[in-house]
Amino acid sequence: MEDPSEEAEQPSGDPGMGMDSVEAGDTTPPTKRKSKFSALGKIFKPWKWRKKKSSDKFKETSEVLERKISMRKPREELVKRGVLLEDPEQDGEDSGKLSHAALKNGHTTPIGSARSSSPVLVEEEPERSLRNLTPEEESKKRLGSTGSQPNSEAEPGPEHAPKQPLLPPKRPLSSSCEAKEVPAGSTARSVSSTSGSTTVTSAATTAATDMTKTVKSFVGPTPAPAPAPRTLPAAPASANTAATTTAPAKQPPIPPPKPAQRNSNPIIAELSQAMNSGTVLSKPSPPLPPKRGIPSTSIPSLEPAASFTTKTANDQREKTVSLCLEPPLIIPPSSPSPPLPTHIPPEPPRSPLVPAKTFQIVPEVEFSSSSDLFQDISQQEDQKTEVPKKIQDQSFGESHIPSRLPPLPLHIRIQQALTSPLPVTPPLEGTHRAHSLLFENSDSFSEDTGTLGRTRSLPITIEMLKVPDDEEEEQTCPFVEDVTSTSATPSLPLCLREEEKESDSDSEGPIKYRDEEEDDDDDESHQSALANRVKRKDTLAMKLSSRPSEPETNLNSWPRKSKEEWNEIRHQIGNTLIRRLSQRPTAEELEQRNILQPKNEADRQAEKREIKRRLTRKLSQRPTVAELLARKILRFNEYVEVTDAHDYDRRADKPWTKLTPADKAAIRKELNEFKSSEMEVHVDSKHFTRYHRP
């Protein structure tokens, strides 16, 4: 069995792929330590069996990924079409890296970053991805703290971090190695050309910068990368390196990361802890635009990105939304502290797209795997923006989506609500249902307005869930078009609507993203426990809601019947009892039949005394034997002699069981004396007398 870490460490010798070797320092344990798992796998057979078992899923994922990668267009064609910017400096330097990165494991890989090479490894083995991403995650975070030397302002203190944007040190390592020769003004451009093979349209990159403000208010100083491969909410944080996230959009799901508190930067550690539940800023990278209220001129390294995005931000807003089909990037309230959301939980299983009742903004970078889709989707979006704008205004302004959209199952919506760290606000209608408590529309996105002349950040709100019995209530409630949404997400409901319709035609762009999402049903392995628990509760709640409550049952059935019929029932019972009692004999009859005794207790006692007296008299007046002989009642023969004898007690002095040996000897002695002297025996038979031994 090949050690996963060996393949992961192959590119470490290259300048662009040296993520694993460069960062094996104090804060991040070296990648070499994973080699012990290979020896363990050779000895411990269940380990080997476990990895073989997961290879089936890996094969399926590989086939899907290769099919999707085959749809990509080569870098040259994208440069010709103007999708990618061509930078001669980067081309010269990246030529050496392309030879290693482009054919990693037979897959075309984004050239611009070492991160893009290791996600491709993740495509090859799901288990390997967990190990590779952890060192990368640590190395990327270390870049944020140590690799920021090219720019003097790149590393603000952790306490000042919320006020300053993330700077180019966050970009992929391959470009950070080159950044030392490239002036700060061209960092954004160099990064975008480095990641050129990821095939992102200019519309996607500019739209990504629109969302960078949102990302920064969420991520704080350092968008800490976490290992979940597909979820890239903060990836678009940089306008021009949004393309570096190609592989993660197709990676198999990875279990939550090992805690990355080893990082030297405390805020990085805090953010990595916040991310480790599954949503990954998988490729948070180069320069983020400045925070609210900070002019772009304050940080020279960000000027190119800021100026580039401000021009086309308004034009490309509508094209951004077609790429919003990934886990939710929630915009916390405008407080500048970075660790506002405690975590970004993993995306829910089976419906990672934009589920009903939730709006999720996710980087365009997600879809660099099929780069040709970006222009097609953007063209479709330009044609379809009218209807989506109306839908988006309604859906963001209203606390619920129009009821014509089929609702997703409650347990999936609960998971998506758990995924978002939005504060729970009390429901508008005042009901205390769990779904309305969990899912409430938040107006905090209105606070998150941007500067630099750009439009507001993309608002992401969690809509109220509807359990089946609430659809009727919502139909009765008038739907008020409260147009409070920003114009940054005009086409967002279009993606939602397309997903809700679940049209499977390959001609529509977002449907291919749905294929990617379907590939990620593997995420159920990590969230199955929560999903099953919520699903069980949801099913039970639905069943119980269909049953009438006890008060209703009592009011509907039993009391109404009893009021009218209880008297009749009582009469029937009474008549039956009366009829049975009437058949009983009267007291006189019972007395005559000696069944019922007379009630007079004195008479009864007198009768008893009379009976006793008669019996006593009869016994006391018994005649003697002489009287009976005289009255001829007793007749004896002549030879019978009647003698008077005194009464004696035949009982012994003590019971025979209590006789001692001395008592027995005395009895024998007395008996012998009687037989020898007192007992009259015929002389001829005297010798037959038997005596007891003394």
Swiss-Prot record:
One of its GO terms (biological process) is actin cytoskeleton organization. Residues 55-84, 381-392 have a biased composition (Basic and acidic residues). Residues 250-259, 329-352 have a biased composition (Pro residues). Disruption phenotype: Neural tube and eye defects in embryos followed by death. By 9.25 dpc, mutant embryos show failure to close the cranial neural tube. About 15% of homozygous mutant embryos exhibit severe exencephaly, along with a wavy spinal neural tube and a shortened anterior/posterior body axis, and die around 10.5 dpc. Remaining embryos exhibit complete exencephaly from the forebrain to hindbrain. Most embryos die by 14.5 dpc, but a few survive to birth and die shortly thereafter. Embryos also have eye defects: they display overgrowth of the neural retina and retinal pigment epithelium. The modification Phosphoserine is found at residues 116, 118, 129, 145, 264, 285, 335, 337, 420, 436, 446, 457, 503, 505, 549, 582, 620. Residues 45-54 have a biased composition (Basic residues). It comes from the Eukaryota. Keywords: Actin-binding, Cell projection, Cytoplasm, Developmental protein, Neurogenesis, Phosphoprotein, Protein phosphatase inhibitor, Repeat. Residues 184-209, 231-249 have a biased composition (Low complexity). The keyword Cytoplasm applies. Regulator of protein phosphatase 1 (PP1) required for neural tube and optic fissure closure, and enteric neural crest cell (ENCCs) migration during development. Acts as an activator of PP1 by interacting with PPP1CA and preventing phosphorylation of PPP1CA at 'Thr-320'. During neural tube closure, localizes to the ventral neural tube and activates PP1, leading to down-regulate cell proliferation within cranial neural tissue and the neural retina. This is Phosphatase and actin regulator 4. The lineage of its organism: Eukaryota, Metazoa, Chordata, Craniata, Vertebrata. The gene is Phactr4.
